[in-house]
Amino acid sequence: MHNYLDNIMPDFSIENEILKLKNNKECIIVGVDEVGYGSLAGPVVSAAVFFPNYNNETTQDINDSKKLTPKTRQKIYNKIITRVKWSIGFAHIFEIDEYNILNATHIAMKRALTGLNAHIDIDYVIIDGNKIPNIPWNAQAIIGGDTISTSIAAASIIAKVTRDRLMETLHIQYPQYNWNKNKGYGTKDHITSLYKYGKTIHHRNTFTPISKISYMFKNS
């Protein structure tokens, strides 16, 4: 069954509404999104993005990264990184295990925003999701924000391409887990390899499949 929502593209409606409410056309509004929340391996990666000019004509192909093919995503990534101000933030495996995935995601978001704020003075932040991290800027969380806001959608693309490249690099060292294809997520082939080879230093120990497999290897 076709979902008509699939045809709806992100735009700058939210950004423009914020500009009107603040009565400030110079207000710097930054979109934030993360990638890797549910993965079994690898870091959480967040991106923060600011468009200097809100122009729908030059951003009409930008969409939620999950709706794009890898080839299209890479093409759009190459185009937008030259047109926006952006920054990346990581939360590493030990942080995910120590602070939990939600808090680690917020750490990654804060790092991305801090990196971007070193170059521009952020006024307002719009974030994909339903929770706002502890940040020193006024912010709004938007469920499904990457399907609504172009700024957030662009952040999702930059974060996704960055993380995918990292997992493809790690695949060279650990080819048995097929990270070049599954990007660390819990696919059937990834789970099968975990039971066969055990975990790596890049796996998240507090995630149930990993903790279960660690216990199995420890007691075998």
Curated annotation (Swiss-Prot):
Binding site residues for a divalent metal cation: 33-34, 128
GO cellular component, as recorded: cytoplasm; ribonuclease H2 complex
Gene3D superfamilies on file: Ribonuclease H-like superfamily/Ribonuclease H (3.30.420.10)
EC number: 3.1.26.4
Top-level class of the enzyme under EC nomenclature: hydrolase
Alphabetical UniProt keywords: Cytoplasm, Endonuclease, Hydrolase, Manganese, Metal-binding, Nuclease
RNase H type-2 domain residues: 27-220
Principal subcellular localization: cytoplasm
Known cofactor(s): Mn(2+); Mg(2+)
Co-factor note (free text): Manganese or magnesium. Binds 1 divalent metal ion per monomer in the absence of substrate. May bind a second metal ion after substrate binding.
Annotated compartments: Cytoplasm
GO molecular function: manganese ion binding; RNA binding; RNA-DNA hybrid ribonuclease activity
PROSITE patterns: RNASE_H_2 (PS51975)
Family: Belongs to the RNase HII family.
Role: Endonuclease that specifically degrades the RNA of RNA-DNA hybrids.
Protein name per Swiss-Prot or TrEMBL: Ribonuclease HII
Origin species: Ehrlichia ruminantium (strain Gardel)
